[in-house]
């Protein structure tokens, strides 16, 4: 550890602030780096980004470590945002946070860390690593199960994990805030960021319409009867209730409507009534673009647990790896609102095995 150089990604939030502090206390040579991944185009977003930079700088000054800024906006646009638009255009619902970790934080940033002569990269993710006797590294859930972020990190491989430290992986979120307060870090009571990093808190629909022309179409029930109009399939996600705009439909009970399926060919959104409507449930899925943390799948066929969305409880399933590398996943219990474009992530106990993109 003595004089090992760690470059920590400082976002201006409490998690990365405490990560930097703990590394400094543990005797590492620490530098904080703020990654700018998006060029803001509206005043509110700009002010919020400026505040994050100011907070990141203040934290580094307070801890007594150097602070740097790096602009990855071009890389982000090319490798994350354009993919995001392609997916939405195809009617899928991508997860840009997963792609951002893969392409920016643990690729572009990692290369930059090497340029700075860093031995390790560190982030404020709630995750852990475990080194096995054979030298391989496991990606392990964060101690705070409620905050575990391995779902977003499943694309990381051995090479990246060997060079990564997750300083708060062994700590509960409440304790992280406590540490920040005790050490007078300005971010101690800053609320957690929500929303996609490049949209922040602003209205998603409004944002997306700037980049993709929407094509309005009809909403049908499961029997093909028209019950309303949609603003563009890309604005809806499977299982969504809000914003469907289906009012009282003649001769139908006053039960909420949910988006169940997208018929891309005919530009039709299929909606059903009731949170637990059978059409919202599936017992199996197929996924592509698999990433295995160990470098390969545990076996051609194996049992494990899986999540089809962040913070979902682990669901028991069987995974079968196909010749082309894709997987078929069969769950013990039917799963609600499995969404194409989102990721399915696999676990055995607290170990994240990897995952793929649902089709």
UniProtKB/Swiss-Prot annotation:
InterPro entries for this protein: MnmA-like, MnmA-like_C, MnmA-like_central, MnmA-like_central_sf, Rossmann-like_a/b/a_fold
GO molecular function: ATP binding; tRNA binding; tRNA-uridine 2-sulfurtransferase activity
EC top class named in words: transferase
Subcellular location, record wording: Cytoplasm
Biological process, per Gene Ontology: tRNA wobble position uridine thiolation
EC number: 2.8.1.13
Region annotation Interaction with tRNA: where it falls in the sequence: 147-149, 309-310
Similarity section: Belongs to the MnmA/TRMU family.
Name under which the protein is recorded: tRNA-specific 2-thiouridylase MnmA
Organism of derivation: Francisella tularensis subsp. novicida (strain U112)
GN (gene name): mnmA
């Amino acid at each position: 550890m003595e004089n090992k150089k760690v470059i920590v990604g400082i976002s201006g939030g409490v998690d990365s602030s405490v990560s930097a502090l703990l590394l400094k206390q543990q005797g590492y040579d620490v530098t904080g780096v703020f990654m700018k991944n998006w060029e803001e185009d509206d005043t509110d977003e700009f002010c919020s980004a400026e505040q994050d930079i100011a907070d990141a700088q203040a934290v580094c000054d307070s801890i007594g470590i150097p602070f740097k800024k790096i602009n990855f906006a071009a890389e982000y646009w090319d490798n994350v945002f354009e993919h995001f638009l392609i997916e939405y255009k195809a009617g899928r619902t991508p997860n840009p946070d997963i792609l951002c970790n893969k392409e920016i934080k643990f690729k572009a940033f990692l290369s930059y860390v090497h340029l700075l002569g860093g031995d390790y990269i560190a982030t404020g993710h709630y995750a852990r690593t475990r080194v096995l006797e054979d030298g391989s590294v496991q990606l392990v859930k964060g101690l705070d199960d409620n905050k575990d972020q391995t779902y977003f990190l499943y694309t990381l491989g051995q090479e990246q994990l060997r060079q990564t430290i997750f300083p708060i992986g062994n700590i509960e979120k409440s304790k992280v805030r406590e540490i920040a307060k005790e050490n007078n870090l300005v971010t101690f009571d800053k609320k957690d960021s929500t929303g996609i990093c490049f949209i922040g808190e602003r209205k998603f629909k409004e944002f997306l319409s700037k980049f993709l022309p929407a094509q309005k179409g009809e909403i049908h029930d499961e029997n093909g009867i028209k019950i309303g109009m949609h603003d563009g399939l890309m604005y809806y996600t499977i299982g969504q209730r809000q914003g469907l705009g289906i009012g009282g439909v003649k001769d139908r009970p006053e039960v909420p409507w949910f988006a169940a399926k997208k018929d891309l060919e005919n530009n039709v959104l299929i909606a059903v009534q009731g949170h637990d409507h059978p059409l919202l449930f599936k017992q199996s899925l197929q996924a592509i673009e698999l990433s295995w943390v160990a470098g390969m799948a545990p076996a051609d066929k194996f049992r494990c647990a899986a999540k089809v969305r962040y913070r979902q409880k682990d669901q028991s399933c069987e995974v079968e790896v196909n010749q082309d590398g894709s997987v078929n996943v069969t769950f013990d219990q039917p799963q609600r609102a499995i969404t194409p474009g989102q990721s399915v992530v696999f676990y055995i106990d607290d170990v994240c095995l990897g995952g793929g993109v649902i089709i």
